[in-house]
């Protein structure tokens, strides 16, 4: 098998330059894909430029960033399509081979304290944006089943964590849409979701000790979450002190599974939620 099985393919990745998204961008570029990466905040501009330069130099691929506010369901899809057309070809010859709907926002609220504004904010980014971005790119998907769509969900869709009325609800919606799209787009692309558990990053550290305590019984049952000597010393220390000796996933561990679903070898897998959580959930 080629070490660059995605040579010449075009991937669109939302939330492409931070956390899991940056790891996905790196993974796809290393396999030869050109990447149109979408980011929202000005604070990501420098990190996007740095990653673009590093990946283009390392892998000889084309990486382009487009800034688009995914909470704007009309403007952001238009900007993404225009950027793809400008950099990778006009409508008549543009093909988007891979779409990774990764961007997401969180918000933890007990049921009695859910603000209406937060409902609209979180559902706009986590549910409506994947719908509208996928819809906008639909004309450019392959017509031979070779396309790949991967939606980044979460174990929050099924675990019933306290305070996850909004976040867990959006991820359950995304998984339901994954199954629908797998049928609707069967002649164009496979459509799957990946459901990480705890992942090292801003959202995980911001959740704090109360949430880590809620996770503890689930993490203790996850066979791959136990820290080892090969893990980063500071993470081992923190896990042993605060997390019952269990660690969150590294970004690359999730990105590798996403990459598997983007490759030609995943052609017979569609409509599935593929676990990427160290065994916190046992299912496909």
Label the predicted regions.
Residues 110-111, 115-120, 149, 211-215, ...:
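Substrate-binding pocket helix/loop in short-chain dehydrogenase/reductase
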Residues 154:
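Residue(s) in the substrate-gating loop at a strand-loop-helix junction
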Residues 10, 17-18:
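Conserved glycine-rich cofactor-binding loop
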Residues 139, 182-187, 267:
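Alpha-helical segment proximal to the catalytic Tyr-Lys
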Residues 134, 170, 178:
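Active-site helix of classical SDR
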Residues 33-49:
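Conserved glycine-rich Rossmann-like NAD(P)H-binding loop of the short-chain dehydrogenase/reductase
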Residues 2, 111, 159, 241, ...:
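Short C-terminal tail/terminal secondary-structure segment
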């Amino acid at each position: 098998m080629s070490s660059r099985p995605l040579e010449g393919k075009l991937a669109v990745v939302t939330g492409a330059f931070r956390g899991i998204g940056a790891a996905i961008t790196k993974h796809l570029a290393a396999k030869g894909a050109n990447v149109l990466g979408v980011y929202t905040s000005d604070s990501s501009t420098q990190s996007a430029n740095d990653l673009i330069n590093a990946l283009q130099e390392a892998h000889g691929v084309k990486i382009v960033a487009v800034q688009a506010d995914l909470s704007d369901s009309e403007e952001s899809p238009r900007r993404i399509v225009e950027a793809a057309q400008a950099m990778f070809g006009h409508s008549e010859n543009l093909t988007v081979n891979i779409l990774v709907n990764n961007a997401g926002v969180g918000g933890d609220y007990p049921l009695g304290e859910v603000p209406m504004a937060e409902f609209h904010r979180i559902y706009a980014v986590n549910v409506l944006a994947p719908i509208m971005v996928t819809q906008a790119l639909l004309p450019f998907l392959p017509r031979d089943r070779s396309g790949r769509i991967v939606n980044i969900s979460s174990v929050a869709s099924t675990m019933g964590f306290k305070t996850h009325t909004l976040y867990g609800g959006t991820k359950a919606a995304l998984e339901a849409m994954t199954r629908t799209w797998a049928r609707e787009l069967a002649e164009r692309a496979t459509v799957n979701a990946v459901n990480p558990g705890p992942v090292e990053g801003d959202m995980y550290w911001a959740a704090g000790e109360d949430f880590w305590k809620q996770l503890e019984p689930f993490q203790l049952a996850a066979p791959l979450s136990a820290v080892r000597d090969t893990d980063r010393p500071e993470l081992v220390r923190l896990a042993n002190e605060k997390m019952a000796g269990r660690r969150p996933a590294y970004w690359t561990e999730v990105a590798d599974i996403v990459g598997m679903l983007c490759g030609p070898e995943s052609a017979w897998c569609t409509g599935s939620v593929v676990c990427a959580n160290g065994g916190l959930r046992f299912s496909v």
